[in-house]
Amino acid sequence: LLERFLAAAPPPVPRESTQGVVDPVDAPFSGFVFKVQANMDLKHRDRIAFLRICSGRFEAGVDAVVSRTGKTLRLVQPQEFMARERTLTDDAVAGDVVGLHDRGSLRVGDTVAIAGGVEYPGVPRFSPEHFAQVKLDEAMRRKQLDRGLSHLAEEGTILLLFAPSLTG
């Protein structure tokens, strides 16, 4: 079934970027982070950034530039996912999705590319539909609350909004 599905699926299409249209086959490696997920492995506190490859060929161990920060990252131990199974992969091509271990340097919407300057439009953000106010019962746990909320915001799960200060 999967082989027939892959045969019928359309190939990757060129994508619009800040440097014009990027061809998925001829252009050097580039991709964008569309999801960041923490704690996928119950035994470890891991954080996986899911990267959709938009152009070129991805190879394990390649040095790439994160467009938002301009920092160079070495992309090691890329993983492919099938249901609950993880497998290490050495390479991937345009249209593939790989998971990268992340230590907090990647966010949803980041563009990762060998050649700096390429930047894809970010993931659209929608206005929140549900609002909640968080009040802390134990003041000694303020740092834990702040850290937890910031992790959820980095994953794109929540949007943090702060009320303006009433003290001036």
Feature names for model-found ranges:
Residues 1-168:
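Structural and coupling elements of P-loop NTPases
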